[in-house]
């Protein structure tokens, strides 16, 4: 017989964080919002990129680390390429059959391999069985991340299999339609809190990653306050100037159209001038871009490598061309299924959409760091161990929600 849980369940929007009675932290500069990265031996924010091909590619991979965010190479890259980067110490996503191939192909790992088993339904028995085999064979030389789950009791099985990180959340992503397609979803705020309570009461070692429903800095902070060890972000990151998605623009002014193209790590951008007396053949159009050294000068360029663009130029372009968008799509969308060569007939549970290109990677990361520092100061938390899962959150009344969001 089916049951109904009548307890109210809350999303991030329903909750806010109550400050500490008294804070002895006198300045944001006095708190540490970072974790240690084994890959770079540097500090990182408690944030992973979603393994989305419209977010991460091989060209922006180290840019994420340089901005204190841990990237995960998505499954659209060739298996051999992912194995190559896996050996270099990068997080890489694999499907079930691919992980089985790794298990059958490697007697041992020369160093620590960071593997995300990237499937939609993290409650499958064969996922648990394969992860248990991997950890039994490779021990601590493999770090496993798996999911997604939306039932706190599943944590016990994950921990028993030796899985190191669990992605928590089903149907909450900005380009995910699992909830509307299947009806399977638990509001993310309550789910993260329930998983944290279950983890602490059972004394489990597994790390919780809040995955889905992140729309702003405060959502990241609330997820941590509720007990997530890390937060996974996809849609927001897809809107970064440096993200892997296509740059699309319909900006028109004074007879010119902003032309931006990004292919294989190279960006071509500038004003594509229409000349009435000349044929509109692309070969006869003049491409101009803002000079990378002086944004007040206009210089002819083409095929400008993304990594040489200064932060000043990137911010100038975002500010100047307000109709700039990035194309993003979920890894369960038709487009991603095509990239992954999924067999025809499988129902898509993701969508494609355009989102405004509003930030550079550095802008967002610095803003996120500052916001997290401020929240930790309000909550008298010197470090993330003091902050994660140790806060009091309050449920907003309907009237307050309307006031806050208006």
Residue ranges and their predicted role:
Residues 1-207, 235-240, 293:
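Active-site entrance/lid segments in N-terminal catalytic domains of soluble metabolic enzymes
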Residues 1-23, 183-210, 214-406:
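Alpha/beta catalytic cores of nucleotide-metabolism and tRNA/nucleoside-modifying enzymes
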